[in-house]
């Protein structure tokens, strides 16, 4: 899988932190996030899922993720936003690629991307969260186009 190494700025994010099998928690988190965004007239810059764990090493019931939107740096959390966290995704060097996800199979492009990175002779994965940015509304289109970001360090 082809990818680029990019220098990314930090992103301020607002949304929900969930623990459990990603195939359940990510959908649940985005359902909550959509309601919060609509109810508070939030204007998201991006829709993002942040992944904190390696599913090959961490049991499914302990997998952590955030379902979030990027917001301006000076974002103030509105009243009645229980459960919503405002934090940031660190800036730095990331390997970045784009993939189309069909049939809710987000795992395959991630495994392909990670396997390509493991073969890289110049960069290695950093022990920081990975994330994906949604480029379209898959619930409407029937597929998702996503940008995948993996933090990297020179070898």
UniProtKB/Swiss-Prot annotation:
Subunit (UniProt): Interacts with DNA gyrase.
Location, primary (coarse class): cytoplasm
Family affiliation: Belongs to the DNA gyrase inhibitor family.
Entry-linked SUPFAM superfamilies: Probable bacterial effector-binding domain
Function: Inhibits the supercoiling activity of DNA gyrase. Acts by inhibiting DNA gyrase at an early step, prior to (or at the step of) binding of DNA by the gyrase. It protects cells against toxins that target DNA gyrase, by inhibiting activity of these toxins and reducing the formation of lethal double-strand breaks in the cell.
PANTHER family (alphabetical): DNA GYRASE INHIBITOR, TRANSCRIPTIONAL REGULATOR YGIV-RELATED
Gene Ontology CC annotation, any one: cytoplasm
A GO MF term: DNA topoisomerase type II (double strand cut, ATP-hydrolyzing) inhibitor activity
Localization annotation: Cytoplasm
NCBIfam families linked to this entry: PRK10016.1
Keyword field contains Lyase: no
Gene: sbmC
Protein name (database record): DNA gyrase inhibitor
Record keyword Lipid metabolism present: no
Cross-referenced InterPro entries: AraC_E-bd, DNA_gyrase_inhibitor, DNA_gyrase_inhibitor_GyrI, GyrI-like, Reg_factor_effector_dom_sf
């Amino acid at each position: 899988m082809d990818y680029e190494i990019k220098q990314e700025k930090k992103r301020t994010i607002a949304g929900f932190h969930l623990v459990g099998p990603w195939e359940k928690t990510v959908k649940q988190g985005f359902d909550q996030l959509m309601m919060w965004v609509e109810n508070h007239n939030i204007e998201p810059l991006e829709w993002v899922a942040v992944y904190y764990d390696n599913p090959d090493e961490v049991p499914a019931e302990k997998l952590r993720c955030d379902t979030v939107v990027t917001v301006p740096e000076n974002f103030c959390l509105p009243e009645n936003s229980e459960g919503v966290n405002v934090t940031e995704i660190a800036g730095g060097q990331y390997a970045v690629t784009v993939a189309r996800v069909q049939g809710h199979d987000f795992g395959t492009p991630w495994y392909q991307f990670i396997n390509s990175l493991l073969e890289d002779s110049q960069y290695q994965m950093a022990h920081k969260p990975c994330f994906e940015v949604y480029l379209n509304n898959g619930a409407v289109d029937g597929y998702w186009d996503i940008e995948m970001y993996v933090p990297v360090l020179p070898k």
